[in-house]
Regions:
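Short acidic/polar hinge/loop motifs at secondary-structure boundaries
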Residues: 179-206
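Periplasmic-side early beta-strands and strand-to-turn transitions of outer-membrane beta-barrels
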Residues: 239-242, 253, 257-368
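Non-catalytic regulatory/gating segments with a bias toward low-complexity or hydrophobic composition
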Residues: 131, 143, 202-203, 222-224, ...
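Short, acidic Ser/Thr/Gly-rich low-complexity loop/linker segments typical of extracellular
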Residues: 47-57
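Short, acidic, small-residue-rich periplasmic hinge/interaction motif at the N-terminus
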Residues: 73-77, 87-132, 140, 168
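Extracytoplasmic beta-strand/coil segments of soluble accessory domains associated
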Residues: 123, 140-182
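Flexible loop and strand-edge segments within Gram-negative outer membrane beta-barrel domains
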Residues: 301, 320-391, 397-418, 450-459
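A short, solvent-exposed loop/turn motif at the edges and junctions
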Residues: 43-45, 71-83, 282
Length: 468
């Protein structure tokens, strides 16, 4: 009877333990005392985020975390933070941010997610605003003017990034930190199967920072970041749309991006459609043109691309978990890409770019028909247990196929089925040091069938542990 009474008192004591809900507010200004509008304020170890208004004011209500560490980000200012420690009363915390000489963006490909100015390794980040201004049909053409980056130019619709003179498998392409899992590293005229229409930023890593993505990426890593899996709560609907037209190839481009939510459920949908004819050029494409080559047209440079992405997340203060699916259909030509066929001659043939109403003469060149389906999941759990501040999970499964079509028939077919899983744990501060450790698993089943199947079929599995 006595033990039962003690147990009842203990349970009652636990249930009646106070749960503090505090309010955190403050003002963000620059060194001249002027308010900074639109600055992003985050509570570390939480999915809570607030943005400053026109007067630089931010506010968090009903904060239940006992330990509060605030971070402030603004693209034109140096990152600010303030560790308040354990608090149980309302807090008023002001920030004064120093201006940055360059746009200051958080690098998500970096394990510790430091900003550009705080990063000790070479990194280039292109933000959403600039990205939409320079966006080209391919990743290689989009990044070709970034420092140390060039393009394996095979026409306006076929190229891949070259970093510090390295391409192919020496340059790794990832989408939201996971391998894009196409076959662009196999051939320089194979496009990267990642899209930029809804990307929030593109990050180019060089040097030791690339080791967290494997030992083979000695040239660099390109990380395309988008918001297909929502990570923060949103009440209502927001989005944007764009359409454009180019005269050089009668090209049309339309994209839309919509995100909405209610309570803990947040969804996202985006997509685009691009359709171009062969590009107009001055004169002939060849140095020594034959009599059948047309003047003023770059043959086999047309493109038709469709892409749709849909994602859904459950977002709470303790973390989030979401899932997304993507479907990419891309048909594009490779100018001047001809193959020997014994004594056969292919002259004066017309190639139809799959339901295009415009016929283009193409003595040389092939059409690449890409079909890719990608499933991706991601999640984050704040303060899961003692000693760990964050636990992150990301996984992707990709089913990729592309056929190189010549004379209306598939010549070589490349396929790749790939799975990529990454788990990261961030430990609490130890003597002023922050760190992360984790593991990654990748499985790839690659095959190529046809006259240009220059690499044998192979199945690869890799496991890795890392500590930073």
């Amino acid at each position: 009877m006595k033990m039962r009474s003690l147990l009842s008192l203990s349970i009652a004591g636990l249930l009646s333990a106070p749960v503090y809900a505090t309010t955190v507010t403050g003002k963000v200004t620059d060194t001249a005392g002027q308010p900074i509008a639109g600055a992003e304020v985050k509570i570390e170890g939480s999915r809570r985020v607030a943005y400053t208004d026109a007067n630089g004011i931010y506010r968090f209500d009903d904060v239940k975390q006992p330990h509060i560490h605030l971070h402030v980000y603004s693209s034109n200012y140096i990152h600010g933070d303030n560790d308040l420690g354990d608090v149980n009363t309302g807090q008023n915390v002001d920030f004064v941010l120093k201006p940055a000489s360059v746009e200051n963006i958080v690098v998500t490909a970096n394990a510790l997610q430091s900003s550009v100015l705080e990063s000790v390794t070479p990194v280039t980040v292109i933000g959403a605003e600039k990205l939409h201004k320079i966006e080209a049909p391919t990743l290689g053409e989009t990044l070709k003017n970034a420092p140390g980056v060039h393009s394996t130019y095979f026409g306006p619709v076929s190229s891949s990034p070259v970093i510090r003179g390295n391409d192919g498998p020496r340059v790794k392409i990832v989408q939201n930190g996971l391998d894009v899992s196409d076959v662009s590293r196999v051939g320089p005229d194979h496009n990267v199967a990642t899209t930029l229409s809804s990307a929030t930023q593109v990050e180019v890593l060089r040097g030791p920072a690339t080791l967290q993505y494997g030992s083979g990426a000695i040239g660099g890593v390109v990380n395309v970041v988008d918001k297909r899996i929502p990570q923060y709560q949103l009440d209502g609907v927001e989005g944007e749309a764009e359409t454009s037209y180019s005269t050089v190839n009668n090209g049309s481009y339309t994209r839309a991006d919509v995100t909405g939510g209610s309570g803990n459920i947040v969804w996202h949908v985006d997509g685009f459609y691009r359709d171009t004819d062969n590009a107009d050029i001055p004169g002939f494409a060849s140095i020594d043109p034959d009599e059948d080559e047309p003047n003023g047209v770059l043959e086999s440079s047309a493109m038709e691309t469709r892409n749709v992405v849909a994602g859904l997340s459950y977002v709470a203060e303790e973390g989030y978990f979401g899932f997304a699916v993507e479907q990419l259909d891309n048909k594009y030509g490779v100018p001047g890409h001809s193959h020997a066929h014994g004594e056969e001659e292919h002259e004066g043939e017309d190639h139809d770019l799959e339901e295009h109403d415009h016929e283009e003469h193409a003595e040389e060149g092939v059409l690449l028909d890409v079909d890719m389906t990608r499933y991706q999941a991601a999640g984050e759990w704040h303060s899961p247990f003692e000693g760990i501040t964050n636990l992150k999970f990301a996984a992707a499964y990709t089913d990729y196929e592309h056929a190189e079509i010549e004379d209306g028939e598939p010549g070589t077919v490349f396929t790749n089925e790939s799975s990529d899983i990454r788990l990261s744990a961030y430990h609490e501060e130890v003597n002023g040091w922050h760190g992360v450790f984790g593991l990654q698993f990748n499985h790839s089943d690659y095959n190529a069938v046809g006259e240009e199947a220059f690499t044998p079929a192979n199945t690869t599995s890799s496991y890795a542990l890392y500590l930073i």
